[in-house]
Each structure stands twice: as C-alpha cells, then as structure tokens.
Design a protein with these regions (language model features):
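Conserved GNAT acetyl-CoA-binding A-motif
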Residues: 117-130
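Acetyl-CoA-dependent GNAT
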Residues: 63-69, 73-82
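Conserved active-site tyrosine of GNAT-family acetyltransferases
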Residues: 136-137, 142
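Short amphipathic alpha-helix that is part of the acyltransferase structural core
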Residues: 2-68, 89-90, 163-189
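Conserved acetyl-CoA-binding loop-helix of GNAT-fold acetyltransferases
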Residues: 96, 101-115
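Conserved acetyl-CoA binding element of GNAT-fold acetyltransferases
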Residues: 85-98
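Conserved catalytic-core motifs of GNAT/GCN5-like acyltransferases
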Residues: 79, 143-166
Length: 189
C-alpha cells in the first residue's frame, strides 16, 4: 500500500514491524501508559509473534520535521458470534504526539486502520477508546454498543504482587510467600 496523503503536512504510512520498531517504541514511550510486561516484550507479542498474524499499524509522518508523530493499530483476533468464529480486530495503540493533536493526523490514522479491516478479511473491530479519542473513533464509523466489563480470576498471586510492589527483592520475597499461602486459596475459590 502506498503512502496516503492527508493534509499537506502529514502523510500516513503503513507500518512495517521490522523497519518501524524503533519509531513505534518512541511514540509509545511518549504517549502510551507503561506496559506491565515492558514495551519491547509487548511489541514482540503483538507486532511480531501474534499467532493470528502481526498487528497492522499505520504511522503519521510530519513533513515539516520528517518524523513520525502518530500511530494507530489493529490486532487480529477471532470473535465467536452466534457460535461461528468471525475474523476480527482489536483497535489499539492509538497515539498522537502533543503538538500534532486537534487538526493533525488523528482522523486519517484511524481511517487507515478501519480501511485495513476489509483489506485483510476482517469483519469488524472493537476497541477501548479513552475520553479524548472517543470523538475520533466515532467520526470514523465506530459505534458505541455498550460498555464492556472485564472479569478476571487471579490464579497466581505473583502477578498482583509484582504489579504493586516496587522493590524487586521485596516483590520476589512476597511472591514466594503468597505462592504458598494465597495461591491455594485462589484456586479453591
């Protein structure tokens, strides 16, 4: 897919997981919440090693600085709809650098991601936009079907301990104790 021109200042470029990894990591560091597993591990998991295929992502290039200032992605998945598996995507990793928001590349980035759905045989996409990106996702055709509640059953207390205990040594000690004392209770509940 060739570069798609948006406004004179920005162009939307299809991302390449090998060629654009450094740019993605930079945009993520500047704009996205910290990934619990770390940025490199998250990138590998979703952009390089996803068993359903690598993420399809797009970058916005600022022609004035010749730098990438935004990104949007879709992650292939499967949904079960009325008993049938449907090829779908999760929309995510949507970020635009400060100073390029507003009338910048946000809408063209999301349009590129939505257009990629059909090109890759995906039937639909869903996402979890924050309050700042909701108007943009609506503008490109997403519909709010309702709120999603996630229910999680923790089976290993180590995951929770490592998330909240800052000291690595203390986290390791607490995880060891919780493995013996809490994990059996978690499995029984």
């Amino acid at each position: 897919m060739a570069d798609v021109r948006t406004a004179p200042r920005y162009s939307i470029v299809p991302g390449d997981p090998v060629e654009h990894k450094r740019e993605w990591l930079g945009l993520a560091d500047r704009n996205l919440p910290f990934a619990v597993q770390g940025r490199e591990a998250r990138y590998s998991k979703y952009y390089e090693d996803n068993p359903l295929g690598p993420a399809k992502f797009f970058l916005a290039r600022d022609s004035q600085s010749d730098t990438f200032v935004g990104m949007a992605a879709i992650f292939q998945t499967q949904l079960r709809v009325f008993g049938e598996l449907v090829p779908a995507a999760v929309a995510g990793d949507f970020a635009v650098d400060d100073g390029h928001r507003g009338l910048g590349p946000a809408v063209p980035l999301q349009r590129a991601a939505v257009n990629a759905l059909g090109e890759h045989g995906l039937s639909c996409a869903y996402g979890y936009p924050n309050e700042h990106s909701e108007p943009i996702t609506r503008r490109v055709g997403y519909t709010d079907l309702g709120r999603l509640s996630r229910f999680v059953k923790v089976l290993r207390s180590r995951v929770v301990v490592e998330q909240y205990v800052q000291s690595r040594g203390l986290a390791r000690l607490a995880a060891g104790v919780s493995r013996v004392t809490l994990d059996p209770l978690l499995w029984a509940a």
